[in-house]
Amino acid sequence: HYYGWSDIFSGDDWYGNLQQMVKTNFLQAALIYIVVMMIASVVLAVPGVTFAIIAGAIFGPWWGTLLCVLSATLGAIAAFLIGRFFLQDSLRDQIAKNRYISRLLFDKNTKNEMMVLMITRLVPLFPYNLQNFAYGITDISLGKYSLGTFVFMIPGVAMYTVGTYALTGASNKLLYIGLTAAIVVAVMVLSKTLRKKYVSEEE
């Protein structure tokens, strides 16, 4: 049985209906989520946090994290390619307005490319959508950019997907709340360390 939108949102238990639809038609639901997130993140610049929360609520902590990171990576690759082949000149003017991105991405004495990727993905000083396009006009390869983006987005995404699941669908809430807290602390410590060690040097 395939649920239509009217079936999902009819009645009081729309959230339960949505979860049942996902279980019954997982591949279709996952593909819809990936396509919608890619379009929304690249074209509409919708914050990725929104989709991380949605993923945690309807796909759970593990599939939600994987699908959100995969979708965000595909969207980031699309922005990277657009920046590399179509927006070179206009992007340089935009990037020049953000001293952090311009120095980290274009300073000849900067750290290695994977380190820069980790910094920009984990330190909340860099507009996410802008950096995706900005990487397109650097010398980094598409393969390295894609791999680094996927890996370094996992902690930030998991923080929201696991946290959302802890509040909405977890049978063992304390376990997932504790896991969320551990991820939050780890992300904050790593972000602060990277900012202090690398970003402050650029200021």
What are the roles of these predicted feature ranges?
Residues 1, 40, 44, 75, ...:
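Alpha-helical transmembrane segments of multipass membrane proteins
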Residues 2-33, 73-130, 137-140, 169, ...:
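Membrane-interfacial helix-loop-helix
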Residues 27-70, 107-166:
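Hydrophobic alpha-helical membrane segments of integral membrane proteins
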Residues 142-144, 172-173, 184:
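Glycine-rich loops and low-complexity Gly/Arg-rich segments
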Residues 161-177:
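Extracellular/periplasmic helix-loop-helix junctions in multi-pass membrane proteins
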Residues 178-182:
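Hydrophobic core segments of alpha-helical transmembrane domains in multi-pass membrane proteins
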